[in-house]
Amino acid sequence: MQTFAEISAIREQVKTFKREGRKVAFVPTMGNLHEGHLTLVRKAREYADVVVVSIFVNPMQFDRADDLNNYPRTLEEDLSKLGGEGVEVVFTPTPEIIYPEGLDKQTFVDVPGLSTILEGASRPGHFRGVTTIVNKLFNIVQPDVACFGEKDFQQLAVIRKMVEDLAMDIEIIGVPTVREMDGLAMSSRNGLLTIDERQRAPVLARTMRWISSAMRGGRDDYASVIEDANDQLRAAGLQPDEIFIRDARTLQAITAETTQAVILMSAFLGKARLIDNQTVDMVVETKEEESSEANSASAE
């Protein structure tokens, strides 16, 4: 496994792979790798001959200095895990390499609409930071395929939109969320939890499943459902942050045409901000079914 910190070095190596006719898959990470990240690596291997992983804690996407400073950094352990997965190349740049003139003078990439709703509304600039670094890493690595976790549902939607709008010749693969045995979504931030907090953390996923069950049971009073869910989180000692129930395709409000909804949740627990999501298939009556029901009612 080769490790590069300089842009020119990794570019030359990727060019060599391409000259050899090898397909390149890319997995961008911020390090502190867990089984969820390794699942992305394994999925990337299914699509390409070579897997490149980046480890870079991107300061542009953090809206709080303490969150950036507290983000776990475990480079040696990360490299050991990636070596065990047979990764060919790891890119480990510093902020000075990625942003040589600082953040204030950095050209940025902004996806309008999707970047400013939901989580983007409460974290101004967050998705701009994500799309800027992902775009820059794509330009450096020049992958054929890139894998992202579905746990960051809105982020994946934003990246897909960026790739589509900018006509990037990169296939984006969404990989299902990997969970602990108790249902908690795997996350680098889980390491910030105390033993007691870790025991309470699965309540987020359980509450999400309760919302899903309520929706499948026919509840469409979403504001009331969200209020009940927040009460469940508070009762378990979590501080609710955001809960959204939206159309999974557009991330807009659910309409009669919505065929799949998504529950987007976040909550604070100690020093950690936990996030999760779940899609819910909606029952949509066809015109034939509606007509049949109307005829039955008339006959009665």
From Swiss-Prot:
Positions bound to beta-alanine: Q61
Ligand binding ((R)-pantoate): Q61, Q155
Keywords tagged on the record: ATP-binding, Cytoplasm, Ligase, Nucleotide-binding, Pantothenate biosynthesis
E.C. number(s) listed in UniProt: 6.3.2.1
Annotated GO CC locations: cytosol
Top-level class of the enzyme under EC nomenclature: ligase
Active site: H37 (proton donor)
UniProt pathway: Cofactor biosynthesis; (R)-pantothenate biosynthesis; (R)-pantothenate from (R)-pantoate and beta-alanine: step 1/1
Domain of life: Bacteria
Subunit structure comment from the entry: Homodimer.
Note: The reaction proceeds by a bi uni uni bi ping pong mechanism.
Function recorded in the entry: Catalyzes the condensation of pantoate with beta-alanine in an ATP-dependent reaction via a pantoyl-adenylate intermediate.
Protein name as it appears in the record: Pantothenate synthetase
Source organism per UniProt: Vibrio campbellii (strain ATCC BAA-1116)
Gene name of the encoded protein: panC
